[in-house]
Amino acid sequence: MPPRLIPPDPHFAGSRAGAAGERAVWRALRDTLPDDAALLADLGVLEGAREHEIDVLVVWPGVGLGVIEVKSGPIERRDGAWYQGRPPNAHRIDPVRQSQDARHALTRWLAANGAPDAGRARAAHLVAFPHTDVPRDWHAPEAPRGVVLGRGDLADAAAHVRRAIEDHGGGHAPLTSTDADVVVALLDAPLPSHTELLAAAA
């Protein structure tokens, strides 16, 4: 059985290349995560006027939370900076900071909205480059190899995410099954239909 999928068949927005990359990472995790985990796509966390986007989120009981920023197309890191695209059209990006900021925003939001233990559970931020080969021995100060998911890692994506959470995740303890359910319920945030509201009031 696959993990819980929210939504079951996500519609990834953005450019064709960007959507294809996010879909590739989502499918890789869908196919490798255990059935007690949950896989969420395209989440937004609004803090005041600042919006954080989470491309893919793994909620894994007994392990923790994995916040993944996906960057499609060719990715390079040179002169201490990240670039997406091919010269002369490459543009500068900061995927590690994006993912890190989103992780902090998510854990703060969880702690403030009824899941304080989940907000303190182990959580890691990762970056995924599904169209870029990343050598096994590569690493950068802000991005050890364990938090970088390259094209060659997709076949074993869940194991890579698990190692990232266990080796590099902040927090105090693994995520319990109960807290995982709370996280999924809070993030899914179903809005009752008019019929359901009438039935509940009857």
Each predicted region: which residue ranges?
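Intrinsically disordered, low-complexity Ser/Thr/Pro/Gly-rich regulatory segments
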Residues: 1-202
